[in-house]
């Protein structure tokens, strides 16, 4: 226990944050299943939860919380060094790579794991720098979809035009799944080009050190949470908006170069 700085104590309340909760819940499930195997049915409803809590409590406080606390600290250190580096090129590279890879993570359902990292960063610094960059990924999809729309119009693919028309408003507001599963992912190439285009916006946002005080949808709706950062609220909101425009343009350009009219006609 650190008497001088209690918040730095290994056993302080909340140590490990979301990571500790996830791992603790996993342990609870495993132990509960084991207890339920040998517990008589007549006693199950009362004693199974009690025994499970007793068996989990001490290891959770003495092992899981401190261990995940160190992991959280390490993750925050890495994010801080990359996303908040004084070296501009480091922030640019980190922003581009993380944003370009975010769409594949969304498609595989792995992007929810980043929420834990958001929580860790918010708890430690009071703001999140990774979320504004990753929010650019959806804007790249919008640019890619617009490029495909014009090609679909040119080749007469009415079905694809209608799908894009219905999905674009949601994409502008940060809901990217209709565009992912209805347009870009089935065609493969636009899925890649959207990420490559969005990377430019992510690099810009990370370079300008845009920060958010919360997280939620991406796109235009995220403008309302870009209220932190070293340059002030107005700069964060403005730079985020510029980042969106960059993603729209670069997503359009990269997709226009990578996807042919024949690809759209056969979609």
Regions found by a protein language model. Give the residues of each.
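Early transmembrane hairpin of solute transport permeases
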Residues: 1-33, 203-208, 235
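Interfacial loop-to-helix junctions that mark the boundaries of transmembrane helices
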Residues: 3-16, 40, 44, 83-87, ...
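Transmembrane alpha-helical segments and their short flanking loops
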Residues: 5, 88, 148, 155-156, ...
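Hydrophobic core segments of alpha-helical transmembrane domains in multi-pass membrane transport
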Residues: 18-30, 52-62, 99-104, 140-148, ...
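Hydrophobic alpha-helical transmembrane segments
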Residues: 19, 46, 50, 92-97, ...
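Juxtamembrane interface elements at the cytosolic ends of transmembrane helices
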Residues: 22-40, 67-75, 113, 254, ...
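Alpha-helical transmembrane segments and their membrane-interface boundaries
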Residues: 47, 55-59, 63-136
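Helix-loop-helix junctions within the multi-pass membrane cores of secondary transporters/permeases
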Residues: 115-198
């Amino acid at each position: 226990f650190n008497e001088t700085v209690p918040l730095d104590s290994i056993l302080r309340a909340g140590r490990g944050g979301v990571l500790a909760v996830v791992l603790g819940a996993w342990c609870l499930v495993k132990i509960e299943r084991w207890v339920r195997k040998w517990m008589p049915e007549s006693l199950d409803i009362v004693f199974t939860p009690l025994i499970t809590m007793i068996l989990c409590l001490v290891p959770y406080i003495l092992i899981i919380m401190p261990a995940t606390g160190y992991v959280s600290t390490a993750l925050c250190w890495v994010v801080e060094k990359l996303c908040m580096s004084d070296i501009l090129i480091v922030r640019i590279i980190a922003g581009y790579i993380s944003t370009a890879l975010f769409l594949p993570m969304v498609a595989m359902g792995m992007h929810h794991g980043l929420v834990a990292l958001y929580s860790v960063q918010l708890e430690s610094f009071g703001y999140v720098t990774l979320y504004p960059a990753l929010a650019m990924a959806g804007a790249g999809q919008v640019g890619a979809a617009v490029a495909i729309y014009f090609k679909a119009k040119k080749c007469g693919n009415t079905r694809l035009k209608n799908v894009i028309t219905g999905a674009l408003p949601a994409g502008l507001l940060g809901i990217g799944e209709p565009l992912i599963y209805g347009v870009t992912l089935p065609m493969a190439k636009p899925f890649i080009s959207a990420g490559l285009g969005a990377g430019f916006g992510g690099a810009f946002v990370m370079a300008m050190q845009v920060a958010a005080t919360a997280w939620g949808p991406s796109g235009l709706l995220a403008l309302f949470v870009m209220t932190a950062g070293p340059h002030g609220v107005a700069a964060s909101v403005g730079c985020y908006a510029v980042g969106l425009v960059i993603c729209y343009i670069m997503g359009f350009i990269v997709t226009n170069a990578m996807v042919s009219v024949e690809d759209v006609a056969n979609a």
